[in-house]
Amino acid sequence: MAARRIAQSSINWSALAERVPANQKSSFGAFKTKSDIYVRAVLANPECPPQIDWANYKKLVPVAGLVDSFQKQYEALKVPYPQDKVSSQVDAEIKASQSEIDAYKKASEQRIQNYQKEIAHLKSLLPYDQMTMEDYRDAFPDSALDPLNKPTFWPHTPEEQVGYKSKEQLEAEAQGHH
């Protein structure tokens, strides 16, 4: 009977353990141990308290009305089971994270399609070991070295080129400071 009380909150520990990162395994083990201790403590007690034989106590206790008073107080005592206030928040977070997951999946599928297009384009090109400088310039005009149309100075880094402006300079110009 006691297992029925906590059956709804049972956790699939093996599935959860697969998702725990390696650096958090010790914390996960400690959490599982504490949970197991709690479950054992709950299961050690019966769901309902044992029935009290009030008639027997009425025979044994000499003070009249004392057992009746205790019986009324005992039967009037109701220990409230705490309300679950967190499950609705968890469900809301699950729904929110599910929408984020769906958006991430859509974006990932789009990225995969773009990467597959890039792969198809790269496969359609001449192999790099067979390319000349002109072939490379035709295939990748943005990254190819073009000394005739866009000459650069050694060491060919953006910082060393004529007209280069740092991020700070560009931000200052955007704000109107010269």
Curated annotation (Swiss-Prot):
<protein>
    <recommendedName>
        <fullName>ATP synthase subunit d, mitochondrial</fullName>
    </recommendedName>
</protein>
<keyword id="KW-0138">CF(0)</keyword>
<dbReference type="InterPro" id="IPR008689">
    <property type="entry name" value="ATP_synth_F0_dsu_mt"/>
</dbReference>
<dbReference type="GO" id="GO:0051881">
    <property type="term" value="P:regulation of mitochondrial membrane potential"/>
</dbReference>
<comment type="subunit">
    <text>F-type ATPases have 2 components, CF(1) - the catalytic core - and CF(0) - the membrane proton channel. CF(0) seems to have nine subunits: a, b, c, d, e, f, g, F6 and 8 (or A6L).</text>
</comment>
<keyword id="KW-0999">Mitochondrion inner membrane</keyword>
<dbReference type="GO" id="GO:0045259">
    <property type="term" value="C:proton-transporting ATP synthase complex"/>
</dbReference>
<dbReference type="GO" id="GO:0070373">
    <property type="term" value="P:negative regulation of ERK1 and ERK2 cascade"/>
</dbReference>
<dbReference type="GO" id="GO:0008340">
    <property type="term" value="P:determination of adult lifespan"/>
</dbReference>
<keyword id="KW-0472">Membrane</keyword>
<dbReference type="GO" id="GO:0015078">
    <property type="term" value="F:proton transmembrane transporter activity"/>
</dbReference>
<comment type="function">
    <text>Mitochondrial membrane ATP synthase (F(1)F(0) ATP synthase or Complex V) produces ATP from ADP in the presence of a proton gradient across the membrane which is generated by electron transport complexes of the respiratory chain. F-type ATPases consist of two structural domains, F(1) - containing the extramembraneous catalytic core, and F(0) - containing the membrane proton channel, linked together by a central stalk and a peripheral stalk. During catalysis, ATP synthesis in the catalytic domain of F(1) is coupled via a rotary mechanism of the central stalk subunits to proton translocation.</text>
</comment>
<dbReference type="GO" id="GO:1902600">
    <property type="term" value="P:proton transmembrane transport"/>
</dbReference>
<comment type="similarity">
    <text>Belongs to the ATPase d subunit family.</text>
</comment>
<feature type="compositionally biased region" description="Basic and acidic residues">
    <location>
        <begin position="165"/>
        <end position="178"/>
    </location>
</feature>
<dbReference type="GO" id="GO:0006979">
    <property type="term" value="P:response to oxidative stress"/>
</dbReference>
<dbReference type="GO" id="GO:0032007">
    <property type="term" value="P:negative regulation of TOR signaling"/>
</dbReference>
<dbReference type="GO" id="GO:0005743">
    <property type="term" value="C:mitochondrial inner membrane"/>
</dbReference>
<dbReference type="GO" id="GO:0005739">
    <property type="term" value="C:mitochondrion"/>
</dbReference>
<feature type="region of interest" description="Disordered">
    <location>
        <begin position="149"/>
        <end position="178"/>
    </location>
</feature>
<keyword id="KW-0406">Ion transport</keyword>
<dbReference type="GO" id="GO:0015986">
    <property type="term" value="P:proton motive force-driven ATP synthesis"/>
</dbReference>
<keyword id="KW-0813">Transport</keyword>
<dbReference type="GO" id="GO:0046034">
    <property type="term" value="P:ATP metabolic process"/>
</dbReference>
<dbReference type="Pfam" id="PF05873">
    <property type="entry name" value="Mt_ATP-synt_D"/>
</dbReference>
<keyword id="KW-0375">Hydrogen ion transport</keyword>
<keyword id="KW-0496">Mitochondrion</keyword>
<dbReference type="InterPro" id="IPR036228">
    <property type="entry name" value="ATP_synth_F0_dsu_sf_mt"/>
</dbReference>
